[in-house]
Amino acid sequence: AGFQHTCGITNSPTNSEPFGGALMCWGFNQKGQAKPPAGTFIQVSCGMFHSCALSIDEHIKCWGAQGIGASPEGEFLQVSCGNFHTCAILKDGHLKCWGKNYDNQVTDAPTDGNFVQVTSGKTHNCAIKKDGSLHCWGSNNRGEIQHPQGYQFIQVSASQWHHTCGITVDHELLCWGADGFGQCSDVPEGMQFTMVSTGRKYSCGILANGTSTCWGQKIQNYGMDQPPGNNTWAQISAGYMHNCGITNEGDSLCWGQDTGGQSS
C-alpha cells in the first residue's frame, strides 16, 4: 500500500513458473504508479508516486514518477519504496538506494554487506543484517533512526512520516520516533508479533495467533484502527491512510481512505 494506490501479486503463476504471479495495481495513477509491467513477480512495494517489484529472475522493475522510479541494474533479494526514493538488497547482501536524497537517505546507506531486509520510509531507511543487528540512516527529525539498542531484530518497517517499528527475535514489538498520535507509545503490550507495517502516523501488526491490530492516528473515519472482520492474516501493508492485507485463506482485503479507489 502506497500513498493513494496499491499493488499486489496474483496467486496464479505466469509463464508456467512454480511460484510468483502477475502484478495488479489500483487507485490513483497520475504518474503511472498503478500501471505495472507484465511478467512474473515475487515481491512488490509502493511509494508516493512510484512502485517497484522484484521479478522471478531477481531483477527489479520500477514504474511511475520518472527518476524516482528508475529500474536499477543487478540481481536483488528485496526492494522497498520510500516516499520519493527506493532501497533494495543486492544478491550479495549489499544495499543500493536511489531517488530523491533530501536527508541523505540515499547516500548514507551502509556500504558493508550481509543485509537480509530493508525498509524505506518518508526520508529514512532501516535495514537488518543476518546477525539481527539493525542499522538506520537518513532523516532523524523525530528520532526515527534512533532505534533501541541491545536487541536483535527479525523485521522492521519505516513509516511514510517519522516513526519506525521493529520486531525482535523474541517477537517483541518496539516503536520509536514521532509519537503525536500514540503511534509509538500506544503499542500493544504483552503480545507477541510476527509482522508490523507502519503507515503515515499509525501502524498495524499481526499477532502470533494470526489476528491483527492497528494503533495510532484515527482520522475522518478512515477505519485505520482495526482490520475488518474476524480474520487471521498472512500479511498486512499499511499505506499513507489505507491498508491492505492477505488473509490466511488467501483473500485480499483493504480498508481506510478510498479517495482514489486504493481500498476498493
Q: Residue spans of the language-model regions?
A:
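Intrinsically disordered, low-complexity repeat/linker tracts enriched for polar/charged residues
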Residues: H5, Q33, Q43, H50, ...
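Conserved core positions of repeat-based scaffolds
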Residues: H5-G8, C25, H50-A53, C62, ...
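Acidic surface patches and DE-rich sequence motifs
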Residues: T10, N29, S55, L90, ...
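Intrinsically disordered, low-complexity Ser/Thr- and acidic-rich flexible linkers and loops
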Residues: P13-G20
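Short glycine/serine- and acidic-residue-enriched loop/turn motifs that recur at repeat junctions
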Residues: M24-A38, W63-G74, F84, W98-T111, ...
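Thr-biased low-complexity repeat/linker tracts and other Thr-enriched repetitive architectures
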Residues: Q43-S45, Q78-S80, K91-H94, K130
